[in-house]
Each structure stands twice: as C-alpha cells, then as structure tokens.
C-alpha cells in the first residue's frame, strides 16, 4: 500500500512511499471493519491486498525468522517519529500480530487454505523474537544492536502474545 495518497490535481498515490508497518495494520483494520459491518463483499474484494501485505513483510525476514532491517528493499517504518527509535523488535511483534489477525480474517472469508501457513509462521516469528529480543534477566524486550528498551517494543510483543500477560506486565513496569 502506498503510504501517501494525494487528492490534487486528481487522486493519486505518491510513488515510492511504502510504510510497511502501516501496511500490516491495514489487514487488522479490514478485519475490524468486517466484524463491525458484516460487509463480506468489500472484505473479499480487498483480500488480495491483505495477502500482498503479508508477502511483502515476510520477504524481509531472515531464514531464522528475524526481521532484517538491512534487507532490500528497505521499507519506511514509522511506529514512532522519534529519530533514534530502533524499530526491529516492534516490527517483529507487529508482523506476528498481523499474521494472526489476517488469518482470523481469512477464516471469516473462507480463505483458510490461502493463509494456512500464517499461524505456523507467526509462531516461528514469536519463538525467534523471544530468543533474540527477550532479556530474561531484566524481563524486557530489547531491540537492535544497542539493545534499546522502549515502551513500543514491549507493547508489540504483548499484543502479539510473544510475551505472556505476566511477562508483559513486568516488562511495562520495568521500562
């Protein structure tokens, strides 16, 4: 999905602006839309976009299921506008969260076969996240080479259920 759509002189996307974290949230928003409205026709029309967002995100993962911040193409990740915020752990949690919500959408649309691997992949991403980003000694998620600790990284690992409720509560209290 394009990160920016301009209205003038006529509606058009701004080429070259793809915000991968927002693209994954599109899938979650479509699930919420379907749950709220029951509008299966629109959700089915937009289903190929959901699949594409997952495909784009998964291409950015290493063989050991860690989001690779240097893998081409390097997508714009917003999460927070803070310049020195390390986004790797947040992206890891968001991808797992989006995969699970996208699979829930697939089930509602009768598209389970197309999305059949998504729960397994989400599990692998979460397992890799715990191994790579979870600092057991301090009970927090760390991100990037400097092992940055942030509320946002904790939140995405909590939302994705990479951390248990107890671990999440401790992490948030520790940050």
Predicted regions: what is each one?
Residues 1-175:
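Active-site core of glycosidic bond-cleaving carbohydrate-active enzymes
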């Amino acid at each position: 999905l394009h990160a920016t759509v301009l209205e003038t002189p006529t509606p058009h996307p701004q080429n070259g602006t793809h915000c991968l974290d927002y693209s994954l949230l599109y899938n979650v928003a479509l699930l919420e839309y379907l749950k709220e409205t029951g509008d299966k026709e629109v959700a089915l029309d937009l289903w190929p976009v959901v699949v594409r967002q997952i495909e784009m995100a998964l291409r950015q993962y290493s063989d050991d299921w860690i989001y690779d911040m240097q893998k081409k193409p390097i997508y714009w990740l917003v999460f927070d506008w803070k310049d020195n915020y390390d986004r790797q752990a947040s992206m890891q949690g968001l991808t797992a969260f989006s995969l699970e919500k996208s699979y829930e959408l697939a089930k509602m649309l009768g598209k389970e076969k197309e999305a059949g691997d998504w729960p397994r992949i989400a599990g692998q991403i979460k397992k890799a996240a715990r191994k790579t980003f979870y600092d057991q000694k301090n009970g927090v998620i760390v991100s990037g080479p400097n092992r940055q600790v942030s509320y946002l990284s904790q939140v995405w690992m909590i939302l994705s259920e990479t951390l248990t409720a107890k671990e999440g509560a401790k992490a948030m209290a520790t940050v």
